[in-house]
């Protein structure tokens, strides 16, 4: 096997052209909105964080009523917490004792790995599996571009989603805010629809029809809210190509749910194994990649009654991030256990399977950390997020513990993919790291690929590729 591409192949900063350094000056980027969410959070105290279930609770609720409210607002674990609360122990000791017995059984089962994934879905656990770096504390938790016209949605740590166009500013951005929308993990604009966006959060799915009259300071209601079974939080979601089906995953559920919003129907894709953590629908609509909180991941065939192939990554890890090539023939992913970039190849509606070698998961790049300048600045290590540009020429990688962004050149052929390290991007300061990245869709075939970077400082940067 040929030697893997690695980060040591990149030239040091001192030899890079100006274009590959911290900024590139492209005239059309000057018309993009200037966004710094940290400044907006400080300047707009009205954009406070809302938490579901905190509004107007009667002080004289009985025990059973409190437990029922906890179940509908927070699911099983909130119910168990309420059953074991000091107030319940005082008013209904038998219920509290029953709660203790249930908690002891679940603790024993988890310790014996009888129910290894049965545990409370805390914000810390959600943060472990989302693609956003330092999700708990990051000013920006997610970015999503509209597929059909210039419109960028930015989800903040304050549970507010701000919608920016080319004419938007911090004071004129459309705002989506609701008590039913907390701990946002993902967002997606609906394909073939100009104004509908769905937001995945602790409470489930919030569907919004974006209206320019929605401004900061007003609390509004989503047009629809879909609750996940058992009131679990959404941790990943993806629309199919034509916007008729929405796939969702939760780290508390083994099933992938396929929603049909127009009919209100949902179909669970059930398999034994650990809960789902990450979904990626292929651009050609043929395949749905589904990672789990453990080594197992699956690739579902969307045209053969949801048949699936089961795969396993390296021991001790799970798939942290993945992305499809624009043509849909290649899938790249990285495990949390090792800094190696892997690929799977898809041709003619089936996984290559004529021989054992063809069906292997192939490593194509070594992402181990290395020093890049005289100051021994490190780049690389365990990957946080992958993003592939719409033209298929560049792959961008961010990392969990180092602050530079690695850029690889990619060369896609029908049956082969080649990759080589190109250069690095860095923030305005050495301490600034990328929280989330995504590419703007191509609105015209000859558009440049524009990478959108949410930095830990709260600012949004746009970087245009050739």
Swiss-Prot record:
Does Zinc-finger appear among the keywords?
Answer: no
What subcellular compartments does it reside in? Nucleus, Nuclear pore complex; Cytoplasm, Cytoskeleton, Spindle
The stretch of residues making up the signal peptide is: none
Q: Tell me the keywords, alphabetical order.
A: Cytoplasm, Cytoskeleton, mRNA transport, Nuclear pore complex, Nucleus, Protein transport, Repeat, Translocation, Transport, WD repeat
Q: Per the record's keyword annotation, is Transport included, yes or no? A: yes
State the WD repeat positions.
135-174, 179-218, 229-269, 271-310, 378-418
State the protein's purpose: Involved in mitotic spindle assembly.
Q: Name one GO cellular component term.
A: cytoplasm
- What is the name of the gene encoding this protein? Aladin
Provide the protein name. Answer: Aladin
Gene3D superfamilies the UniProt entry points to: YVTN repeat-like/Quinoprotein amine dehydrogenase (2.130.10.10)
Biological process (GO) annotations held by this record are:
microtubule bundle formation; mitotic spindle assembly; mRNA transport; nucleocytoplasmic transport; positive regulation of protein localization to spindle pole body; protein transport
Identify the main location.
nucleus
Domain of life (superkingdom):
Eukaryota
Tell me the organism. Answer: Drosophila melanogaster
């Amino acid at each position: 096997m040929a030697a893997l591409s690695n980060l040591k192949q990149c030239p040091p900063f001192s030899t890079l052209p100006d274009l590959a350094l911290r900024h590139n000056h492209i005239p059309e980027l000057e018309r993009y909105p200037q966004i710094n969410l940290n400044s907006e959070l400080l300047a707009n105290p009205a954009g406070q964080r809302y938490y579901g279930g905190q509004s107007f609770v009667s002080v004289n609720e009985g025990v059973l009523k409190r437990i029922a409210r906890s179940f509908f607002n927070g699911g099983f674990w909130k119910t168990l917490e309420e059953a074991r609360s000091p107030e319940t122990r005082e008013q209904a000791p038998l219920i509290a004792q029953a709660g203790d017995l249930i908690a002891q059984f679940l603790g024993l089962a988890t310790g014996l790995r009888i129910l290894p994934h049965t545990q409370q879905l805390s914000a810390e656990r959600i943060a472990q599996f989302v693609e956003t770096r330092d999700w708990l504390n990051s000013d920006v938790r997610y970015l999503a571009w509209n597929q059909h016209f210039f419109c960028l949605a930015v989800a903040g740590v304050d549970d507010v989603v701000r919608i920016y166009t080319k004419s938007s500013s911090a004071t004129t951005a459309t705002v989506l805010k609701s008590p039913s929308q907390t701990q946002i993990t993902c967002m997606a604009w609906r394909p073939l629809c100009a104004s509908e966006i769905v937001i995945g959060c602790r409470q489930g799915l919030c569907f919004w029809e974006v209206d320019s009259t929605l401004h900061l300071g007003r609390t509004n209601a989503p047009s629809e809210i879909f609750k996940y079974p058992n009131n679990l939080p959404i941790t990943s979601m993806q629309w199919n190509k034509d916007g008729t089906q929405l796939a969702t995953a939760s780290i508390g559920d083994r099933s992938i749910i396929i929603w049909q919003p127009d009919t209100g129907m949902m179909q669970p894709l059930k398999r034994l194994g650990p809960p789902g953590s990450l979904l990626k629908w292929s651009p050609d609509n043929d395949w749905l990649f589904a990672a789990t909180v453990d080594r197992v991941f699956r690739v579902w065939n969307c045209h053969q009654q949801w048949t699936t192939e089961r795969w396993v990554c390296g021991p001790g890890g799970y798939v942290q991030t993945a992305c499809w090539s624009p043509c849909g023939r290649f899938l790249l992913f990285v495990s949390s256990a090792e800094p190696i970039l892997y690929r799977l190849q898809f041709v003619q509606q089936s996984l290559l399977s004529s021989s054992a070698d063809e069906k292997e998961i192939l490593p194509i790049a070594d992402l181990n950390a290395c020093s890049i300048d005289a100051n021994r600045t490190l780049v690389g290590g365990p990957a946080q997020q992958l993003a592939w540009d719409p033209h298929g020429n560049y792959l961008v990688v961010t990392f969990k513990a180092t602050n530079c962004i690695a850029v690889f050149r990619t060369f896609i052929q029908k049956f082969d993919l080649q990759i080589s390290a190109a250069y690095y991007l860095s923030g305005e300061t050495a301490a600034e790291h990328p929280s989330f990245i995504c590419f703007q869709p191509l609105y015209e075939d000859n558009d440049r690929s524009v990478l959108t970077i949410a930095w830990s400082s709260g600012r949004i940067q746009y970087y245009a590729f050739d």
